[in-house]
Design a protein with these regions (language model features):
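ABC-type ATPase nucleotide-binding domains, specifically the catalytic core motifs of the NBD
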Residues: 16, 72, 97-117, 123-125, ...
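The feature captures the beta-strand-to-loop junction immediately N-terminal to the Walker
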Residues: 37-39
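Helix-to-loop junction immediately C-terminal to a conserved catalytic motif
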Residues: 52
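Conserved ABC transporter NBD signature motif
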Residues: 60-68, 80, 113-117, 215
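ABC ATPase NBD coupling module
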Residues: 68-89, 93, 117, 129-132, ...
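Conserved ABC ATPase signature
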Residues: 134-138
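ABC ATPase C-loop
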Residues: 151-152
Length: 228
């Protein structure tokens, strides 16, 4: 197995008076894709948001290449090479596609935007064709593709993808899976509610239920279908 890029150990998250996550532990090696599968409300999104720093953790540790992330704000985590695709895409409608792609690098004060754009356009030529179009003019599928490209812009080391296939036609889902699998040397943690869609990407599947891990990657993956 490749060296570990992301290591989440015994993480708990409390929002208001509710403990949302309990004892979450997982690893994502460099160059590999790990899936996190669970019902709506199981804690998938909160897990990703805790890794990128959008929600604080109550206890435990989150490490990227051995560096503790717990006290680092989100923009510093982006500088370390973490890209995040939220489920709702969150493109800025008034900006062009290219401006949306550059946003995470601007926010993290990084100056290699043109090099990263060249990489994106090589990997996803359909995004290059949309570069000067306003985000408001894009279809839902195009928005999802651009949001993935924006995550890859920042995600030199780790990509966090929240329900990337949600709302997409099967053909576009397969294309998106091909793009994600084509990434080299990047660790990918992806969430899904449908284990069959997850298998478009990986057989390394964790299962989360009610904020707790119940299945680890590579262990009894066929049993994961029971959550559907």
């Amino acid at each position: 197995m490749s060296p570990t890029a992301l290591e989440v150990h015994d993480v708990a998250v409390k929002l208001a008076t509710f403990v949302i996550l309990r004892g979450i532990s997982l690893r994502v090696p460099h160059g590999e894709i790990v899936g996190l599968v669970g019902r709506n409300g199981a804690g998938k999104t909160t897990t990703l948001r805790s890794i990128i720093g959008l929600v604080p953790i109550l206890s435990g540790s989150i490490r990227l290449n051995g560096q503790e992330l717990t006290n680092r704000p989100p923009h510093e985590r982006v500088r370390l090479g973490i890209g995040y695709l939220p489920e709702d895409r969150r493109l800025i409608a008034s900006l062009t596609v290219e401006e949306n792609l550059l946003l995470p690098l601007w926010a993290a004060d990084q100056d290699d935007g043109q090099n990263r754009l060249a990489l994106i356009y090589d990997l996803m030529p359909e995004v290059k064709r949309l570069a000067l179009r306003r985000a408001a003019a894009l279809s839902g599928g195009q928005q999802k593709m651009v949001a993935l490209a924006r995550a890859v812009m920042a995600g030199r080391t780790l990509l966090l993808l929240d329900e990337p296939f949600e709302g997409l036609a099967p053909l576009l889902s397969r294309h998106l899976a091909e793009v994600i699998r084509a990434l080299r040397d990047v660790a990918v943690l992806v969430t899904e509610s449908d284990v069959n869609r997850m298998r478009l990407l990986t057989d390394q599947i964790c299962t989360i239920e009610r904020g707790e891990m119940v299945l680890e990657p590579g262990v009894g993956n066929s049993d994961a279908s029971r959550i559907r």
